[in-house]
A protein has these predicted regions:
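Short, cationic low-complexity segments
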Residues: 44-66, 109-113
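Active-site-proximal alpha-helical segments within enzyme catalytic domains
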Residues: 65-73, 149-151
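Residue-level signal for threonine
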Residues: 61-62, 70, 242
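Acidic/polar-rich alpha-helix caps and helix-coil junctions
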Residues: 1-40, 76-254
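Intrinsic disorder/low-complexity segments enriched in polar/charged and small flexible residues
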Residues: 49, 58, 68-71, 131, ...
């Protein structure tokens, strides 16, 4: 695939400042403008924001997700965690103590010892408080990014028994988006584990996790770990075939 590149500022793809960038292959289009008489806005920013920001605190960063973001430690440029952590969530870190990195505010302006959680998603919040404070916002939602192409290609190479071809693709995403050094490990199992980690931190809140887990055969394990005991991968992995299709096509076997 040509004509696309990874965007160096990961968070800008989700805060409305870098719509339809060089990495974007397909994204849902929203706008704050109502000049044409139409309304193309959403309220996802309120779903992810904590109550202290007048948010609904409904879509939270899980403990698992938080730990995954920080699991490699401060190995990124500037002695930071994976840069995607800062583009995806607000958490207790010196980066957020000053400089107004939370829509012009600092960590202690948003959280105190009584906060229900000490971390929330930053992804899909607009870049400024004035935009955030609107009831509806016009930030776009990426559906397919070039990073996904690279990591899918890496996964294919690895499944074909060529981890050496997958590693440079993984490292490209790590370097540009995470500001991270090259991955460690070189065998097929290590590369598979790295791909699973990269996809989790790269595409959080981008609707890929269910399909990744299904492809890897890990849906039951993940759902049970989250307390979803009523889930069964054999029953719930795919949507049912519409009855009309079954009735009109004798070749369909339920």
């Amino acid at each position: 695939m040509t004509g696309y590149e990874l965007e160096s500022d990961y968070g800008s793809m989700f805060d409305g400042t870098n719509k339809n960038c060089k990495e974007s292959i397909l994204e849902l289009q929203f706008t704050n403008s109502t000049a044409d008489g139409t309304f193309h806005k959403h309220v996802l920013h309120f779903w992810v924001a904590p109550g202290s920001m007048s948010g609904w605190d409904e879509i939270r960063v899980s403990d698992m997700m938080y730990n995954e973001f920080l699991k490699e430690g401060r190995i990124a440029e500037g002695n930071m965690y994976d840069a995607r952590a800062y583009g995806s969530m607000m958490f207790d870190d010196p980066y957020y103590y000053e400089g107004g990195h939370i829509l012009g505010y600092n960590y202690d302006d948003i959280y105190d010892e009584n906060s229900a959680t000490r971390y929330n998603y930053r992804k899909y919040m607009p870049s400024t408080w004035s935009d955030y404070a609107q009831n509806y916002v016009g930030t776009n939602m990426p559906l397919m990014r070039y990073a996904n192409v690279l990591l899918m290609k890496a996964e294919v190479y690895n499944e074909q028994g060529h981890p050496e071809k997958a590693i440079p693709l993984i490292n490209e995403v790590r370097s540009v988006h995470g500001k991270l050094p090259a991955m460690t490990g070189s065998d097929q199992a290590a590369v598979k584990a790295q791909i699973e980690h990269e996809r989790l931190v790269e595409f959080t809140l981008e609707n890929s996790r269910f399909y990744d887990l299904r492809r890897w055969g890990k849906l039951d394990e993940a759902m049970k770990a989250d307390g979803r005991t009523g889930f069964s991968a054999s029953t719930h992995s795919f949507l049912p075939i519409p009855l009309m299709e079954i009735q009109t096509n004798n070749e369909i076997n339920e």
